[in-house]
């Protein structure tokens, strides 16, 4: 995923947390903030050290980025998304992560159309 599609700065994360809306399930919390001036969506990831060592945390982040890469045409543009991974994600496979992420994105209304 290209760097322009990522949220990196703490100030940008804080803006999404404070001004955005949130939706959650057992595995993920997603914060969304509308950005009408931005033609694409951006994602920021937060994976706590409570989830495991660096290898586990990096794997979780790769899984989440891959889901967004595969679904980029179905996710609403002009938004910033911050995804916070919760503890159950540490033991999940890629397909379980994808299913859970799609569930919370659907709940949040972040998908252009309904995807199975």
From Swiss-Prot:
EC number: 3.1.26.5
Any one Gene Ontology molecular-function term assigned to this protein's record: ribonuclease P activity
Matching SUPFAM superfamilies: Ribosomal protein S5 domain 2-like (SSF54211)
Domain of life the protein comes from: Bacteria
Cited PROSITE patterns: RIBONUCLEASE_P
Enzyme category, top tier: hydrolase
Annotated catalysed reactions: Endonucleolytic cleavage of RNA, removing 5'-extranucleotides from tRNA precursor
Keyword list, A-Z: Endonuclease, Hydrolase, Nuclease, RNA-binding, tRNA processing
GO cellular component annotations of the record: ribonuclease P complex
A GO BP entry: tRNA 5'-leader removal
Transmembrane segments: none
Keyword Methyltransferase: no
Coiled coil: none
Alphabetical list of HAMAP family matching this protein: RNase_P
Family, as annotated: Belongs to the RnpA family.
Protein task: RNaseP catalyzes the removal of the 5'-leader sequence from pre-tRNA to produce the mature 5'-terminus. It can also cleave other RNA substrates such as 4.5S RNA. The protein component plays an auxiliary but essential role in vivo by binding to the 5'-leader sequence and broadening the substrate specificity of the ribozyme.
Oligomer and partners: Consists of a catalytic RNA component (M1 or rnpB) and a protein subunit.
Name of the protein this chain belongs to: Ribonuclease P protein component
């Amino acid at each position: 995923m290209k760097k322009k599609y990522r949220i990196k700065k703490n100030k940008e994360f804080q803006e999404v947390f404070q001004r955005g809306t949130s939706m959650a399930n057992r595995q993920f919390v997603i914060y969304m903030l509308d950005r009408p001036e931005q033609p694409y969506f951006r994602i920021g990831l937060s994976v706590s050290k409570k989830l495991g060592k660096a290898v586990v945390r990096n794997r979780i982040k790769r899984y989440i980025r891959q889901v967004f890469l595969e679904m980029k045409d179905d996710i609403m543009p002009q938004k910033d998304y911050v995804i916070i991974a919760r503890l159950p994600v540490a033991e999940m496979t890629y397909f379980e992560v994808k299913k859970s992420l799609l569930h919370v994105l659907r709940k949040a209304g972040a998908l252009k159309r309904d995807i199975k």
